[in-house]
UniProtKB/Swiss-Prot annotation:
The gene is metE. One of its GO terms (biological process) is methionine biosynthetic process. Zn(2+) binds at residues 652, 654, 676, 737. This is 5-methyltetrahydropteroyltriglutamate--homocysteine methyltransferase. It comes from the Bacteria. The active site is at residue 705. Binds 1 zinc ion per subunit. NCBIfam families: met_syn_B12ind, PRK05222.1. The keyword Transmembrane does not apply. L-methionine binds at residues 442-444, 495, 610. Keywords: Amino-acid biosynthesis, Metal-binding, Methionine biosynthesis, Methyltransferase, Repeat, Transferase, Zinc. Signal peptide: none annotated. The keyword ATP-binding does not apply. 5-methyltetrahydropteroyltri-L-glutamate binds at residues 16-19, 117, 526-527, 572, 616.
Length: 764
């Protein structure tokens, strides 16, 4: 027998049921009881699907209303004072939502907690806020209730909780100036670990045998103080009346191997997709009786698994460990869509290459049966079918485009250089004539139900091309007139034609495919549907020129052309795994270069190439950074360097803690960079104390992820803080991010206030 288990399942539902239920609750259309019922239905369906795949245990604790780290933060009672949590009382669902998004059906609206990327994924977590002397207690019962819920349905359960070291590492606080690795946070372990021990004891009383405790920071560059803390923390949990499976993922243990192997725990999970070479060393270092969970199915991409290769890789460990070798996905399946069975629109050939969360569990079950007994009934036939699908993909004529191959071969000779910034900015100012502290937005405007219905009707054929174009033009004109009315300086067309900043471009590029229900959670209730890059990328025709040139024709003010950058398209897609990511990114850059040149020729003289994902692409280990940054910067410059000096190139980056890569950001040589800084109170600008950023910069002055309207004086204060580090003549005033997810009333109020703040700055 081979034990198979899962680290976590997508929580959103195959049809995004959780998103709809949560948003209906926020808007007052559903009650809390309605929301709880939806949660129970989803959990039951997810547990049943996982059990049907043959898992020994179903995970409990992977479900979350907004974010699993936020769930755990509230269970620990770590609620910042501004949320008014009554001492000793349970943390309510509305308090959780206020921490995540700033407001809820009850409770006073207040500034949300910071949100940032989860390791190098496109998932966002809510950052725990920590203070010296922080107290902890069990302040919510959801974990224990859900364990009993699953048990009542007949399931064997494996609770999943964030580990104490990873939770602390991901936390922040004003007193912890050193960032995520600040060793001062480790002093909180003395009050944190007793609550962990209490949680584990209560789980044991519910009949739980195994608890998965996630410690993915073991794949990072850890300071020695944190390695030492692992040993002392888990020594204090060693007497817990449950077996602990410490789960690591997103990379290899490397120099943390000895630390991980020394932990007094019953099992260790490792990622064999990102770090296949660690299997032998980990297996050899286990203590007698200790379990190794092999993360052998890719939890972050959507391609079918080469089960023959997996079996060959696992064979030595199986021989060494026997049934102490467990099988699992590499990480939580949170990062992939729910079920390929819903993709009836995909052509059969492409569909046969794919595997979503449900299918990955089926692959896992097949792998477990094959490892235990390759002669078991049905195993050989199932492996043969898997083999045939992989062979068909390798041999498909859809994968390679000879024209793209020829252009790639010549790409090293294509210029990446523009005139010096001082020369460019002088020529741009002569052309654009912008005031001090120029105002702009990041690109998108609110996507109303009417706009979404318009696109849906057009795609379904219910609306003609001419009627659709007329309606989109009307919306663009409305957005232009609004921006003129409130006094913005550099306008945007609002992107009403775009459902998503990556999917829109993918639909117009060769080498991409799209799903109908391939949704994954990005943050809170926001889900994205990543395109699939299955083959060589090329641009058959202009993608944005018509809409952007029309918008520019409506006004004398400059209108930005809006593109998504090559690195972000790469990062936010499911990328082919048959060639290096760098090569796919360069194909994207060449396609975008053609679009940039066409926009300039159409009279669009300000062009924004968004790269919000450039930092998330950073390898988790610092030793691997420079190689990535070299090709990422090269791809950006390749996409932007084909225009004249007086065409202004903007780029945008959100949630980007890139203080430590600022030299590479400067090397991108965008004329203007706009960044996310409001939630972190301009924390990013610490980089400029040591580095003199050479070009213009727009530090975001309000958080678009919260519906709260920012105070004018607060925005002025943020900009004055920025001006203390940067020359004021190089500062722009803008929101943190695009306005797509916001409603019009709050958008109008916020932008009017932002323009007022800019005018106050100009007045001194």
């Amino acid at each position: 027998m081979t034990i198979t288990h899962n680290l976590g399942f997508p929580r959103i539902g195959a049809q995004r049921e959780l998103k709809r239920a949560v948003e209906a609750y926020w808007s007052g259309k559903k009650t809390a009881a309605d929301l709880e019922e939806t949660g129970r239905e989803l959990r039951a369906a997810h547990w049943q699907r996982q059990a049907a795949s043959g898992l020994q245990w179903v995970p409990v604790g992977d479900f979350a209303w907004y974010d699993h780290i936020l769930e755990w933060t509230t269970l620990l009672g770590a609620v910042p004072a501004r949320f008014g949590q009554p001492e000793g009382q349970p943390v309510s669902l509305d308090t959780l939502f206020r921490m995540g998004r700033g407001r809820a059906p009850s409770g006073t609206p207040t500034a949300a907690c910071e949100m940032t990327k989860w390791f190098d994924t496109n998932y966002h977590y809510i950052v725990p806020e920590l203070v010296p002397g922080q107290t902890f207690r069990i302040a919510r019962e959801y974990l224990f209730e859900q364990v009993q819920e699953a048990q009542a349905l007949g399931h064997q359960v494996k609770p999943v909780i964030p580990g104490p070291l990873t939770w602390l590492w991901q936390g922040k606080g004003d007193a912890y100036a050193g960032g995520a690795s600040d060793a001062a946070k480790l002093q909180l372990l003395d009050t944190l670990l007793p609550v962990y021990a209490e949680v584990l004891a209560r789980l044991a009383r519910l009949g739980v045998e195994w608890v998965q405790i996630d410690e993915p920071i073991l794949v990072l560059d850890l300071p020695q103080a944190w390695r030492d803390a692992f040993r002392t923390a888990y020594a204090r949990l060693a007497d817990a009346p449950v077996k602990l499976l410490v789960a690591t993922y997103f990379g290899g243990l490397n120099d943390n191997l000895a630390t991980a192997l020394a932990l007094p725990v019953a099992g260790l999970h490792v990622d064999l997709i990102r770090a296949p070479g660690q299997l032998q060393d980990v297996a050899a270092g286990l203590r007698p009786g200790q379990v190794l969970s092999a993360g052998i199915i890719d939890g972050r991409n959507i391609w079918r698994t080469d089960l023959d290769a997996a079996l060959a890789a696992l064979a030595p460990a199986r021989q060494l460990l026997g049934e102490r070798l467990w099988l699992a996905p590499s990480c939580s399946l949170l990062h992939v869509p729910v079920d390929l069975a819903n993709e009836t629109d995909l052509d059969a050939e492409l569909r046969s290459w794919l595997s979503f969360a449900a299918q990955k569990l089926d692959e896992l079950g097949l792998l477990g049966r094959a490892l235990a007994d390759a002669r078991a009934p049905g195993v050989d036939e199932a492996l043969a079918a898997q083999r045939a699908a992989l062979r068909a993909r390798r041999q498909s004529a859809r994968i390679h485009n000879p024209a793209v191959g020829r252009r790639m071969a010549e790409s090293n000779a294509v210029t990446r250089e523009r005139a010096p910034f001082a020369e460019r900015i002088a020529r741009q100012q002569q052309l654009l004539k912008l005031p001090a502290f120029p105002t702009t937005t990041i690109g998108s405007f609110p996507q109303t139900a009417e706009i979404r219905a318009l696109r849906r009707d057009w795609k379904s054929g219910a609306l003609s091309d001419s009627a659709y174009e007329a309606a989109i033009r009307k919306e663009i004109e409305s957005v232009i007139r609004f921006q003129e009315k409130i006094g913005l300086d550099v306008l945007v067309h609002g992107e009403p034609e775009r459902n998503d900043m990556v999917e829109y471009f993918g639909e117009l590029l060769a080498g991409f495919a799209f799903t109908r229900n391939g949704w994954v959670q990005s943050y809170g209730s926001r889900c994205v549907k990543p395109p699939i890059i299955f083959g060589d990328v090329a641009r058959p025709a202009p993608m944005t020129v018509g809409w952007s040139s029309y918008a520019q024709s409506l006004t004398d003010k400059p209108v930005k052309g809006m593109l998504t950058g090559p690195v972000t398209i790469l990062q936010w897609s499911f990328v082919r795994d048959d060639q290096p990511r760098e090569q796919t990114c360069r194909q994207l850059a060449l396609a975008l270069r053609d679009e940039v040149v066409d926009l300039e020729q159409a009279g669009v003289r300000v062009i924004q190439i968004d790269e919000p994902a450039i930092r998330e692409g950073l390898p988790l280990r610092r030793a691997d950074w420079q190689a990535y940054l070299d090709w990422a910067v090269d791809c950006f410059r390749l996409s932007t360097a084909g225009v004249a000096a007086d065409t202004q190139i903007h780029t945008h980056m959100c949630y980007s803690e890139f203080n430590d890569i600022i030299e590479s950001i400067a090397a991108m040589d965008a004329d203007v960079i706009t960044i996310e800084t409001s939630r972190s109170n301009m924390e990013l600008l610490k980089a400029f104390e040591d580095f003199r950023y050479p070009n213009d910069i727009g530090p975001g002055v309000y958080d678009i992820h919260s519906p709260n309207v920012p105070d004018v004086d607060w925005m002025v204060g943020l900009m004055r803080k920025a001006a203390g580090r940067l020359p004021s003549e190089r500062l722009w005033v803008n929101p943190d991010c695009g306005l797509k997810t916001r409603a019009w009333p709050e958008t109008e109020a916020a932008l009017v206030g932002m323009v007022e703040a800019a005018r106050a700055l100009r007045a001194g």
